[in-house]
């Protein structure tokens, strides 16, 4: 049985950790460097740092903050936001990141993602997917991103059986791209892991979108991190469970319940261990 991972997430805006609901109504949650050190000391398995406005503001990730965070942690650190090129990935790795996630740029320019995977190895590259359920009969974005010449033009567009749509720029831009198809495609480009966020569940504390998580986890052969909706350790257990109705994820990411003190990492792991999930021991 593979060890399951618990991953706190630092969504960073203007140098501060923030958290919202369905990607809006952001509120302050603290200093990223202090929180990183806190979670490392608590026994988190990894840490994710996302500069959530870098892509929409067309700027680079806040390198100096990443460097200061990396100096405080001794667990794997994944960094994303505003990553567009091989050079951007190199800067973040040099600043102390262990893994780099790409989202918007990977959809816009899949070759850039593939080039980064080839340059640094797929163990360093995470594909971040922000997905939203398609409302039956509702509007679907024209997949204008799949312009003539886009390598995924004939494979990725939403079809009659599609259930989730990919969104870019911090959840601001619908794409007309099928999330399940994109996950499989990105794995083929060289992604070593999927960071999958349900926009519908994000921040609501009602549990992960298990259908979405399970569908993508079952479709790819690389690890999947479930994100969006954790309200308690039981929700994480559901996302990590390999039972038919579980999420089949390899890791569970959470923010609100950790940032605002509802649960500690140790409390979470203790409860997950009761669900027969293999966990690395936490620090009290």
Label for each model-derived stretch:
Residues 4-10, 19, 47-49, 77-81, ...:
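Hydrophobic faces of well-ordered beta-strands that scaffold small-molecule active sites
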Residues 11, 39, 47, 79, ...:
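Conserved, mostly hydrophobic/aromatic
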Residues 12-14, 18, 97-195, 200-201:
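Conserved anion-binding
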Residues 28-40, 84-90, 175-185, 235-236:
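Short, acidic/polar
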Residues 46-64, 104, 195-206:
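Glycine-rich, proline-tolerant flexible connector loops at the mouths of alpha/beta enzymes
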Residues 57-80, 115-130, 205-231, 275-277:
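Alpha-helix-loop-beta-strand connector modules within alpha/beta enzyme cores
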Residues 73, 77-99, 135, 211-251:
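Catalytic cores of alpha/beta
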Residues 113-120, 240-283:
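C-terminal helical cap(s) of enzyme catalytic domains, especially alpha/beta-barrels
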